[in-house]
């Protein structure tokens, strides 16, 4: 999805705003890695050719083939179709993803835009893809926002009725820090400050007291269901294998994923939830534009 697609959706720019708030200026994640329409419009044909020549080379590519295949035949076909493409012996260095100081305190912003209802967005820096702490954090997000029985949905949507929806998930990155992002849309007539307070209260409760045995069992079952669904689709399998090969140099990780999640304990989930602190928090509110007013970002 390009940035122009995000711009044209209600709340669509929230992802861009969260990146800019969670990562410092100059960091590669401060802006979307896909770039912007402004970048594309400013690029010359030579810029595009140079970029292609620099990065699109066989020694910088991963080809994944899944299914009931003849391995020798596939290797021969790859050699036939791609073997004549020259490698790039001078691949550019990847950008430095090192993060200096932590957030060091809550970062807050309000955006007035053409949206139907106020919506709360949260972000927290998180462990990297491949870190042993990330699966525990993903289980924490399932406990907090995985379906109707999750803590946030039960408390904010069904019990207190301050939100129309509630979500929390991990955006895994391989450098700097991953990001946990959450959101909740204010129910008409409800109080925005109360919605935010209740959302944060549920995050704090998991960090303070950890999950119950029932919650751990439910979260593992949800993740197992997602894994089984992924493995029923060849395209999803190929995408997952390709991601692990490209980012972690570990294509076989897909065969260990389920065991990794099943091996996470409640104490590890509670420890992972410690990232939900005010010192590591980005708060972004979207508010509808009043009639006749201009959007602000």
What residues fall within each predicted segment?
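A common structural junction motif
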Residues: 81-89, 200-211
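C-terminal soluble interaction/assembly domains
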Residues: 249-252, 273
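Hydrophobic side chains in well-ordered alpha-helices
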Residues: 74-77, 152, 195
């Amino acid at each position: 999805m390009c940035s122009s697609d995000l711009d044209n959706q209600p709340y669509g720019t929230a992802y861009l705003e969260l990146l800019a708030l969670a990562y410092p200026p100059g960091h590669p994640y401060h802006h979307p890695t896909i770039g912007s329409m402004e970048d594309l419009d400013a690029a010359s044909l030579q810029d595009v050719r140079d970029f292609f020549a620099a990065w699109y080379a066989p020694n910088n590519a991963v080809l994944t083939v899944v299914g009931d295949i003849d391995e020798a035949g596939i290797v021969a076909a790859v050699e036939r179709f791609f073997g004549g493409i020259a490698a790039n012996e001078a691949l550019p260095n990847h950008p430095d993803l090192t993060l200096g100081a932590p957030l060091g305190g809550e970062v807050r912003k309000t955006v007035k835009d053409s949206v139907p209802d106020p919506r709360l967005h949260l972000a927290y820096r998180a462990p990297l893809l491949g870190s042993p702490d990330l699966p525990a954090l993903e289980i924490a997000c399932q406990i907090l926002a995985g379906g109707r029985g999750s803590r946030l949905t039960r408390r904010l949507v069904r019990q207190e009725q301050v939100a129309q929806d509630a979500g929390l998930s991990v955006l895994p990155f391989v450098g700097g820090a991953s990001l946990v992002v959450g959101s909740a849309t204010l129910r008409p007539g409800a109080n925005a400050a109360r919605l935010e307070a209740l959302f944060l209260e549920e995050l704090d409760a998991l960090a303070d007291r950890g999950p119950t045995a029932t919650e751990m069992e439910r979260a593992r079952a949800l993740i197992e269901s997602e894994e089984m669904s992924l493995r029923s689709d060849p395209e999803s399998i190929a995408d997952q294998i390709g991601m692990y090969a490209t980012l972690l140099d570990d294509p076989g990780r897909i065969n260990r994923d389920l065991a990794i999640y099943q091996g996470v304990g409640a104490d590890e989930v509670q420890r992972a939830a410690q990232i939900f602190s005010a010192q590591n928090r980005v708060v972004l509110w979207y508010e509808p534009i009043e009639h006749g007013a201009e959007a602000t970002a």
